[in-house]
């Protein structure tokens, strides 16, 4: 079993309806799928790959060797207790945001700025596809994420998490990234095309998200689940630690503004059914998520203050 791979370019041709159906089915049955022919230039993707890997080697690799995950793993190995590090991720991370560009590594600033704009455009297109498949007005999801604003400067949160999962001497004792669902909206992942490790939970089984050169992996977060009234599900996923290879992962998140009110869209409800989720302010949801990220998601929807 493998996650769906969808040719996004066919949205503009004779196979549009088939492609829309494939995306709808992937959102409903998986919450994860891969896009090929998505429109982001290959030359740009190659630059992003090289610069991200170079940045890790020159600016982050040495620091990771003395990081908390390394120290804790070494201590655990010395104890030889048979335990596993349950609350630690074997991951190096830095985050790129619009307002912290002065903190971006200088050698990647121009390229990553260009890449983020391309990914932001792809996120908008994907949300419009979801609008259409859910029977929502065009632009509904994006408008909801931007506090109901249709024009002007976007208020939605758009961040890019650049991760590396370095070789781990004891991958059986630590997670690359613990299992979780994503809190926000639409996630667009440019993952390593050589080293695997990302898995998604499907029908009780962990399925590898197969490396596919220059594809963009799409996954739906908790807020898409809420807006669709459960028709689309946010999927549990994790990253395994590896003994060999330094796995690269560049995930961009198009999330609601912290002030945005999120709830099931009326047209997304099945006829005769009740709303399955409360309406809440996304920032309030994030307050709950911060303490419950790696726990079952259903209690989060109950714990958040409803409007």
UniProtKB/Swiss-Prot annotation:
Q: Which Gene3D superfamilies match?
A: B-lactam Antibiotic, Isopenicillin N Synthase, Chain
Q: How the cofactor binds, per note?
A: Binds 1 Fe(2+) ion per subunit.
Residues recorded as binding Fe cation, renumbered to this chain, are 180, 182, 237
Q: In which pathway does it act?
A: Alkene biosynthesis; ethylene biosynthesis via S-adenosyl-L-methionine; ethylene from S-adenosyl-L-methionine: step 2/2
Q: What is its EC number?
A: 1.14.17.4
- Coiled coil ranges (UniProt) are 106-134
InterPro entries, per the entry: DIOX_N (IPR026992), IPNS-like_FE2OG_OXY (IPR044861), IPNS-like_sf (IPR027443), Oxoglu/Fe-dep_dioxygenase_dom (IPR005123), Plant_2OG-oxidoreductases (IPR050295)
What this protein is reported to do is described as: Enzyme involved in the ethylene biosynthesis.
Name this polypeptide is given: 1-aminocyclopropane-1-carboxylate oxidase 5
Q: Which organism is it from?
A: Arabidopsis thaliana (Mouse-ear cress)
